[in-house]
Amino acid sequence: GKNDYEFLPNGSYQWTAKKYESKLQNLSKVLGSLSRDLVPEGPAFIGVAEAENSRVLEDLVKQPAISNYEFVHYEGPDRRGIDCALLYDPKQFSVTHSKLVLSTPFEGDTVHLTRGFLIVDGQLAGERVCVIVNHWPSRGAKSPVRVHAARQVKALKDSLMRSDKKLKLIVMGDMNDDPM
């Protein structure tokens, strides 16, 4: 099982139904207001780096501010129950294929597996667009662990681009590092 007990009422964060509902409302208000000044419909998709499970995502997209969104999520290997997901507006972006590509262990470490790479392929404004949602290891891990994740994303990108040279590819998420 997943080690996410700290988010229960008796856990260290003392989550209650009231706290949960408040979090959903606040998150949905922020997400619902993103880019509205530039794109009245809002973003076509939003990458999520720390989703606990599909139930939480279902509850989130039921909120009035983002009820037009659907989501893609796969249960990943992270022992804390933290996964990547993609929220998307089906009127703007139609999903044609999705999968979770598991990360390979860094130097054989199978205990501290990262969340994997969520790949979502679809159509946006008549063009094929592929999104890779990431959540790389934290800064508590050594830099080579994040470099290892970056190399895996590059290999995924190279493979996708070999099959379609005109592919529009977006890599997003929490890379737990500063831009270079």
Question: Language model features by range: what are they?
Answer:
Residues 1-82, 150-151:
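N-terminal, active-site-proximal structural segment of metallo-dependent hydrolase catalytic domains
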Residues 49, 134, 173-174:
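Active-site flanking residues adjacent to catalytic metal/cofactor-binding acidic residues
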